[in-house]
Swiss-Prot record:
Gene name per UniProt: rplI
Organism the protein comes from: Clostridium beijerinckii (strain ATCC 51743 / NCIMB 8052)
Alphabetical keyword list: Ribonucleoprotein, Ribosomal protein, RNA-binding, rRNA-binding
Family per similarity comment: Belongs to the bacterial ribosomal protein bL9 family.
Superkingdom, taxonomy of origin: Bacteria
Physiological role: Binds to the 23S rRNA.
HAMAP family, per the entry: Ribosomal_bL9
GO MF, one example: rRNA binding
GO cellular component assignments: ribonucleoprotein complex; ribosome
UniProt-listed InterPro entries: Ribosomal_bL9 (IPR000244), Ribosomal_bL9/RNase_H1_N (IPR009027), Ribosomal_bL9_bac/chp (IPR020594), Ribosomal_bL9_C (IPR020069), Ribosomal_bL9_C_sf (IPR036791), Ribosomal_bL9_N (IPR020070), Ribosomal_bL9_N_sf (IPR036935)
Name the UniProt record assigns to this protein: Large ribosomal subunit protein bL9
GO biological process terms held by the UniProt record: translation
Amino acid sequence: MKVILLQDVKKIGKKGDIIEASDGYARNFLFPRKLAQEASDANMHILNNKKENERKQKLAELEAAQKLAEELKGKEIKIKAKTGENGKLFGAITSKDVAELIREQYKIEIDKKKIVMDTIKLAGGYEIDIKLYPEVSTKMKVIIVPQE
């Protein structure tokens, strides 16, 4: 009997897979536990619609991430910070600070988890990586200027 998996099942397959299962296994194990449903024409149609909608949504997210990457590419952020001897900062600049400054200066909302950088503790120029989507990333320049 052909069944559509509704959840990942160890050693059987992943959610959305269409597998061949024995009648007893399907009726006595998979169906009662809501792990699978019969692969009827109606259920296959629903599955295909879900997969198509997911594909369209991922494509839209990818396009939005690429557009955002183009907007941010080559931009820079200047931060004035109090420094001590040798340009060492009092405190540090983190990805949270950079995300807030991007929001303030460019009106673009970016999650701090998407900003890949080490904590900045010295004045100077730094290049940070922003991973907007698994295959879309961009670079920005952060300049730390000592406060007078």
